[in-house]
Amino acid sequence: MPHATVESVMTSPVVRIAPETGFREIVALLTEYDITGVPVVDPDGRPLGLVSEADLLRTLAAQEDPGSLLPAPESLRVGTGGEITAADLMTAQPVCTTPDSSVVAAARLMSRHGLKRLPVLDEEGRVIGMVSRGDLLRVFLREDRVIRREIVEEVLGRIDGVSPAEIGVEVDQGRVVLSGTVPEAHLVPIVLNLCRSVDGVVSVTDRLRPGGATAPVG
């Protein structure tokens, strides 16, 4: 039972910038497209780094006039060189993912590295999309009826010895309640774990009984 993939939730096509893109142009792009980060790519579209709002804000905070939200153009300089560019701002060698990775794998990757977004690469290593924490969380917006159907058909309907007709499945805002009878006690944790793995499930309440067990009174 596969999870949703990165491809199903990522933003694509994606805004990309070159290493020489200037500070102000980066700010304009983030504002225009209402995004919080942008990948820096080489001429072939392969990732060199990422520039985020946090990177831009750190630059503003370092200016001589920290009270100015719009520093004068001449203040956005690095040493004796020209305007600050993406190459100066970016986090190099970004952690990336692929379109066919599951949303769970992408979430673990973000959590492990403390990241808010990941570039998505095609088979040639070129940036074709971006996926953010918010994108991954969209799987929890699946309709209850869709979640229930997947549990009945893809979970209960595929476990040997389990009859979907003997198990009640209620879903409310992603919260699942299972009731009814399974033939053997060892099948209960299997059913519960598989239901928890369904995209969009927030919690699973167990009211299952092994075959032959007496229902609790009260």
Protein language model regions, located:
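Tandem CBS (Cystathionine beta-synthase) repeat/Bateman regulatory domains
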Residues: M1-G218
